[in-house]
């Protein structure tokens, strides 16, 4: 029996030594040869590390040691821990389980507070969006073509109209004076932009080269007009300008031909045109008119004969009176003639 007890004690001692050697062989400070940590030399974690106020007591940073020594805070170190530390540890797993819902409640409360803060922030941001939407929109005026034409005419006369000119325009266009002022500001900005793009030639900016030449009645260069006779307009120096020139010439020729046709039609319209119905009526009345004239002819003839007899008698009497006056004169002239022929 004594031998058995001795063998049992020896085996237990060997198992304890083996367990101690196995425990120490797994220690990181034994593997790395670190002996400076006072807590690791005793084989337990400092007091209060497992009952920290962190949400999760198994967190990496809950132990008082460094992060890679957290494996040392296991069952072995807890078993070797002194009595004060054991008193601070939870007695059963139920206490640990009961402590976990509190952490969940706290986290849920945190989430609820975060959601309420987000909702309040969202409401404030939404209120800001509504406030921005409630801002007064700028009044935009839609101009008619007549109003634009009148404003353009005034802009050609003056880029900076005075208050009197703006009031006159307001009466013509039925616009407010401030709207007219804003339109002129925008139009001046547009004009400056086009002037900056095209230079000082605002005519070029508004109408282009061909429009400027037509507006000022400038002749096209000979290089372009000579190339107009060519079959291919692309061979000219400015094919687009030549194309516009040809189109304008064709339009002018067509307009001239139309005007000539209108003039000839107007001349024909001036002549009286008898419709065929009137011609038939005239042809029907012609024999009746001839008969009426023939019936009235003797009366007219008698009256004409009476008138002619009176005229003839009066003319004969006048001739006789003249002859009676001319006879003495003829004798006197004959007497003078004889005296001239017979001188003394």
Curated annotation (Swiss-Prot):
All residue ranges annotated as the CVC domain in the record: 196-250
Entry comment describing in which tissues the protein is expressed: Expressed in several neurons including AIY, CEPDL, RID, ALA, RMED, AIN, AVJ and CAN neurons.
UniProt biased composition (Low complexity): 106-119
Assigned keywords, A-Z: Developmental protein, DNA-binding, Homeobox, Neurogenesis, Nucleus, Transcription, Transcription regulation
Signal sequence residues: none
Transmembrane segments: none
InterPro entries referenced in this protein's UniProt entry, alphabetically: CVC (IPR023339), HD (IPR001356), Homeobox_CS (IPR017970), Homeodomain-like_sf (IPR009057), VSX_homeobox_regulators (IPR052294)
Protein name: Homeobox protein ceh-10
Organism for this UniProt entry: Caenorhabditis elegans
Gene: ceh-10
């Amino acid at each position: 029996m004594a031998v058995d007890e001795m063998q049992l004690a020896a085996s237990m001692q060997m198992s304890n030594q083996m367990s101690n050697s196995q425990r120490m062989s797994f220690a990181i400070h034994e593997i790395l040869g670190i002996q400076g940590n006072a807590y690791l030399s005793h084989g337990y974690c400092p007091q209060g590390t497992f009952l920290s106020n962190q949400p999760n007591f198994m967190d990496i940073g809950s132990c008082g040691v460094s992060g890679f020594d957290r494996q040392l805070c296991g069952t072995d170190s807890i078993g070797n821990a002194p009595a004060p530390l054991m008193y601070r540890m939870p007695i059963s797993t139920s206490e640990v389980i009961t402590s976990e819902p509190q952490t969940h409640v706290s986290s849920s409360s945190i989430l609820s507070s975060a959601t309420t803060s987000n909702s309040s922030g969202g409401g404030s941001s939404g209120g800001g969006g509504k406030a921005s939407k409630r801002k007064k929109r700028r009044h935009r005026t839609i101009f008619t073509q007549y109003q634009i034409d009148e404003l353009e005419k005034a802009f050609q006369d003056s880029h900076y109209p005075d208050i009197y000119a703006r009031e006159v325009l307001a009466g013509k266009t039925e616009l407010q004076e401030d709207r007219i002022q804003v339109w002129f500001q925008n139009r001046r900005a547009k004009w400056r932009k086009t002037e900056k793009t095209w230079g000082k030639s605002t005519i070029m900016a508004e109408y282009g080269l061909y429009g400027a030449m037509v507006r000022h009645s400038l002749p096209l260069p000979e290089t372009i007009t000579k190339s107009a006779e060519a079959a291919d307009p692309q061979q000219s120096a400015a094919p687009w300008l030549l194309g516009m020139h040809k189109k304008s010439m064709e339009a002018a020729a067509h307009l001239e031909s139309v005007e000539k046709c209108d003039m000839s039609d107007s001349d024909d319209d001036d002549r009286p045109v008898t419709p065929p119905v009137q011609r038939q009526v005239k042809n029907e009345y012609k024999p009746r008119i001839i008969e009426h004239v023939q019936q009235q002819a003797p009366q007219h003839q008698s009256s004409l004969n009476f008138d002619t007899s009176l005229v003839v008698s009066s003319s004969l009497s006048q001739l006789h009176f003249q002859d009676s006056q001319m006879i003495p004169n003829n004798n006197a002239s004959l007497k003078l003639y004889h005296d001239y022929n017979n001188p003394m």
